[in-house]
Amino acid sequence: MLTTTVDGLWVLQAVTGVEQTCPELGLRPLLPRLDTAERALRHPVAAELMAVGALDQAGNADPMVREWLTVLLRRDLGLLVTIGVPGGEPTRAAICRFATWWVVLERHGNLVRLYP
């Protein structure tokens, strides 16, 4: 499981070249001409991703994280879930499948959680 911010997810998208994850969760698509890996690696959250092992020192994404993002990009089935509590901000989650692989991407405010 990886917990990061919306900006952290953007850094991972730029490094892996995954242009789109889940627009249903209000996540912006990657613009390859502007959102380059070099630019993303200069973002302060890149150091946090390196500290938790999502990125290596060369700026490459962990292979498992790359696979999770690929499932989101190439999904053939997706289920959107909204969990709300009165008076609180809802948590939204996309449960996505590609072939036999399943990945969940949750969003609560600025935090995102990605896991199989």
Residue ranges of predicted features:
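Accessory beta->alpha helical hairpin/"wing" motif in late/C-terminal subdomains of nucleic-acid enzymes
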Residues: 56-103, 107-116
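Short, amphipathic alpha-helical interface elements at domain boundaries
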Residues: 1-50, 54-74
